[in-house]
């Protein structure tokens, strides 16, 4: 037992993080993009579908939070979202039409992202205030572990080219299998509400507008949110297109790509823990600035590198930088936002990340298509990396005037 909370409920919640990363890595990051491009879809079509599904999630996530609060039960919504994602992923394993596959991918991605919102909101159900951070950390660790194990469990079912479709059905089944403990053992407390007060949902939209206006009174915070949009735009895109770039621009084999992704995941753990240490020692804003410079160097190397052997070094570098970025940038927000508005501005922080996930894939895809039209062939992907470098550079320039968090004074307009 964890206090009055059954240990099986805690383990069930942690297991769900293990489960959902099997989907996100195998479908979103690893197999769907290369497979659908081999089937004849354009980069622009793929980017548009990723952007559209991200936009749907950005629009519905505040409403989903309100609905779950109003109903008083989140687990039923988690089950519905998970089953919808599993069903769409199973469909990907059987579908023949490119456009049907794109639609199923969009549905799976929306259901997956919506499920994450509900899943995160279940953390207070399986934890107490004093152990919440520890249990959340176990979930993150289980997620990294699930990504690596899921990658290699599915690998025997996925061939090359069109045979990559074989990855989707086992991925769906593994997601469902490891999600079952959460479905079975998490018990929500409190009274069930009978209906949703949609006036509260409209209030969320009104509050979002007020939050954006409110952020204007804090110039440093506003600068940081805009900078985050720019660098998150690049990083969210990298997560989605890394396998495509490794295959098409560098010439890596499927086995090599699996190793590259596994290395990046392992080193993301190192980056997360190491980033936390340096944040405490040097300050979050300073660490984030150094990390963004690291991104510029790493992507610059990736843009010009042609050796498959040398490209293996890019995976660990990206992993470390991803872990350190997400560790440091959320701390920057806590230093810049007034304590009484921290939740409000974390919502804006999250929205910036979601919108970056919409814009980034579109910009990437449009750059690839335009460059290919200009006759650059697979070098078009290198040009697209150059655009990501520009986005991170702009984000870095926007961050520089923000004072270090050890001496932050929040100024009002």
What are these regions (language model features)?
Residues 59-73, 270-284, 368:
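Helix-to-loop junctions at the C-terminal end of transmembrane segments
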Residues 76-91, 286-301:
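Structural signature of the two symmetry-related core transmembrane helices
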Residues 2-54, 220-258:
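Helix-loop boundary and gating motifs at the non-cytosolic
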Residues 156-173, 366-392:
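A membrane-interface helix-boundary motif in multi-pass transporters
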Residues 1-7, 189-226:
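Juxtamembrane intracellular "pre-TM" segments in multi-pass secondary transporters
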Residues 174-185, 385-413:
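Multi-pass alpha-helical transporter architecture, strongest
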Residues 114-127, 324-338:
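Intracellular juxtamembrane helix-capping segments at the cytosolic ends
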Residues 88, 98-115, 310-324:
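Hydrophobic core of transmembrane alpha-helices in multi-pass small-molecule transporters
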């Amino acid at each position: 037992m964890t206090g009055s909370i059954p240990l099986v409920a805690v383990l069930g919640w942690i297991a769900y993080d293990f489960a959902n990363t099997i989907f996100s890595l195998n479908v979103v990051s690893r197999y769907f993009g290369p497979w659908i491009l081999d089937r004849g879809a354009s980069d622009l079509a793929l980017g548009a579908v990723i952007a559209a599904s991200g936009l749907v999630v950005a629009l519905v996530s505040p409403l989903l939070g309100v609905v779950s609060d109003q109903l008083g039960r989140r687990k039923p919504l988690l089950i519905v979202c998970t089953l919808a994602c599993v069903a769409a992923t199973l469909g990907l394993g059987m579908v023949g039409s490119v456009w049907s596959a794109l639609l199923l991918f969009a549905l799976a991605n929306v259901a997956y992202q919506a499920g994450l919102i509900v899943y995160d909101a279940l953390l207070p159900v399986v934890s107490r205030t004093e152990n919440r951070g520890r249990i959340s950390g176990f979930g993150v660790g289980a997620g990294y572990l699930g990504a690596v194990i899921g990658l290699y469990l599915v690998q025997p079912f996925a061939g090359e080219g069109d045979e990559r479709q074989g990855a989707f059905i086992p991925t769906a089944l593994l997601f469902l299998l490891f999600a079952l403990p959460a479905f079975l053992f998490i018990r929500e407390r409190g009274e069930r509400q009978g209906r949703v007060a949609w006036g509260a949902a409209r209030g969320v939209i009104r509050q979002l507008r007020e939050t954006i206006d409110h952020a204007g009174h804090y110039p440093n915070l506003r600068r940081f949110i805009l900078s985050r949009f720019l660098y998150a735009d690049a990083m969210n895109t990298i997560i989605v297109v890394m396998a495509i770039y490794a295959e098409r621009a560098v010439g890596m084999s499927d086995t090599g790509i699996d190793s590259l992704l596994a290395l990046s995941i392992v080193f993301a753990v190192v980056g997360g823990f190491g980033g936390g240490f340096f944040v405490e020692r040097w300050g979050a804003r300073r660490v984030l600035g150094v990390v963004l410079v690291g991104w510029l160097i790493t992507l610059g190397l990736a843009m010009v590198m042609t050796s498959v052997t040398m490209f293996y070094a890019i995976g660990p570098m990206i992993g470390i930088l991803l872990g350190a970025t997400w560790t440091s940038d959320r701390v920057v927000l806590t230093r810049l936002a007034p304590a009484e508005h921290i939740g409000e501005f974390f919502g804006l922080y999250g929205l910036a990340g979601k919108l970056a996930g919409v814009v980034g894939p579109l910009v990437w895809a449009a750059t690839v298509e335009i460059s290919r039209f200009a006759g650059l062939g697979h070098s078009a992907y290198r040009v697209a990396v150059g655009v990501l470098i520009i986005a991170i550079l702009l984000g870095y320039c926007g961050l520089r005037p923000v004072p270090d968090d050890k001496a932050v004074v929040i100024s009002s307009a």
